[in-house]
């Protein structure tokens, strides 16, 4: 049934017997689909009242038990207590110095705050077994 439909020019080149067989196949498939529809999609024809007849009324919610004090969530502490925001230095006067001026200050945005990254050039590429041409 999942056959590719024939174009009109291909159908005209076929003989009449083949066209008749294709027509019979399509009629048979349509008839089977019509017979199978109520079993597969019949629930779509029932009304909403009929669907809701068998349902019960919603139950009353159960009372929630009292939780111990150590289960409660503590209030959130302010971010300023944990994160220190340093003041920014003045913006450079030249346009060439403007690009990357914040990253050029080691005290401002140093990612290696607690320890330095000790890695030689291409160490990760060698772990991946890349050829030497892949290491820049």
Swiss-Prot record:
It comes from the Eukaryota. GO terms for cellular component: cilium. Keywords: Cell projection. Transmembrane segments: none annotated. It holds the Pfam family LLC1. This is Ciliary microtubule inner protein 1. It is found in: Cell projection, Cilium.
